[in-house]
Amino acid sequence: MSEYNAQDYKFGQPRWCPGCGDHFFLGALHKAMGELGIAPHNIAVISGIGCSSRLPYYMNTYGFHTIHGRSAAIATGAKVANPDLTVWQVSGDGDGLAIGGNHFIHAVRRNIDLNMILLNNRIYGLTKGQYSPTSVRGFVSKSSPYGTVEDPFRPAELCFGARGNFFARCVATDLASAVECLKAAAKHKGASVTEVLQNCVIFNNGTHESVYTKEGRAKNAIYLEHGKPMIFGENREYGLMQEGFGLKVVKIGENGITENDILVHDAHCKDTTLQLKLALMEGPDFPIALGVIRDVEAVTYDEAVHAQVQEVKAAKSYHNFSELLETNEIWEIK
C-alpha cells in the first residue's frame, strides 16, 4: 500500500468556474498520484496557457506554468535533464493542438517519457469562447458567428499518426475510469496521451453530454480492457464484431451471436489498425471508447539520449568540459 494519499498532492484553492470539468480531473489526478505512491518531490507538473493550465498551482509537487503551446517542449527538457523525474504535461485542446500542435506530435513521435494530458472541451475558455481545433464543424462561437467551416482534429488520430504508443480516453466526471487511465499512463514507459472529455459550463456546456453522466455512459460508451471482450450497453447486451475492414455493433443473443463471437480488446498489439478504429468510434451508430486503447512498449527518447551520452563518453579521452579544455596545448594570456 502507498504511504501517500490524495491529500498529500493537494495545494491551494482552485479558481475555476463552479462545475468546470477541471475540478473533476484535478480530483482524479490527486487520487491517481496517491495510489501510485510517487513522492511529491519526484513529480513535476508542467502546463501551457489556458484554464486547465492553472493546474500546477493546485499540486503539492514541482510545477511550471509556462508559455502558450510550449509545455511539451519544456517538459521534454525537464525529463531529459532529470530522467528520474515523473513529468506530467497538461494542456487544453486550444493550447495543446493549435499553437502547441507541432510540439505535441513531435513529443509523441520521439516517445519521450511524458504523461501528456489533453483536457478537451472543444473551446477556448480562458479567452472567452472562440472555437478550437477540436470544435465540431458548424460550431457557432465568438470567432465563428455563422458556424465553423472546417473539420476538427481528432486527438486519437494525431497521436496514432505520430506513431504514439499509448492512448487512453476518459470522462472528467467518471472518477474511477479517469484514475485507472492516469495510473496506466504513469506506468507506461514512453509518451502517454490521455484525452479527457470535459464540458466548459460557460462557453460550451454539454459538448460531451452523451457520456457526461453515468446513465449516458451506460448507453453511449464502451469501457475497453485489455484481454476482455468488447461488450457494452445498460445490460451488457451489445458487443463489437469485425465486418470487412470495419466494425459493427451486434446484440448478444440475436442471430446465434454469443459472447464468444465478440472481439477481444488487445491494447498491446503493435498494429494500430483496430485500435484506431476503436478510438474513432462515435455516436449515434457506435459507442465512444473509454479506457486504455493502446499501450505498447518501445525505447524512449530520454533513455536513448543518456545511453548515447555514456557510449560517447566511454570512447573519448575526456569526460567533461573541464577535461576537454585540458586535452590539447594550453597557454596563458597575460
Residue ranges: model-predicted function:
Residues 3-4, 84, 132-185:
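Conserved thiamine diphosphate
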Residues 6-67:
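Active-site diphosphate/adenylate-binding microenvironment
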Residues 2, 11-12, 202-334:
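Flexible, low-complexity linker and terminal segments
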Residues 49-125:
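Thiamine diphosphate
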Residues 168-223:
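ATP/pyrophosphate-binding catalytic subdomain of soluble kinases
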Residues 49-51, 121-123, 174, 197-202, ...:
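Glycine-rich beta-alpha junction loops
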Residues 12, 39-43, 81-87, 109-115, ...:
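Short coil/turn connectors at secondary-structure junctions
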